[in-house]
Amino acid sequence: MRYTDSRKLTPETDANHKTASPQPIRRISSQTLLGPDGKLIIDHDGQEYLLRKTQAGKLLLTK
């Protein structure tokens, strides 16, 4: 599979690649994800990461 300019998956022309129907990417609002405090701890492979909303309204992920 490869991306086109419209960022949709398209099958490769190579016969060695299987064509799979792409599943939609899940979408969630940052407000729902971060909650009223604007912070979320993510556990990834035993490591903790903090995702938070900055005062400027941007998202910041730190270890």
From Swiss-Prot:
It comes from the Bacteria. Pfam families: hemP. Signal peptide: none annotated. Residues 18-32 have a biased composition (Polar residues). One of its GO terms (molecular function) is protein homodimerization activity. Residues 1-17 have a biased composition (Basic and acidic residues). Residues 1-32 are annotated as: Disordered. To Y.enterocolitica HemP. NCBIfam families: PRK10183.1 (NF007559). This is Uncharacterized protein YdiE. It comes from Escherichia coli (strain K12). The gene is ydiE.
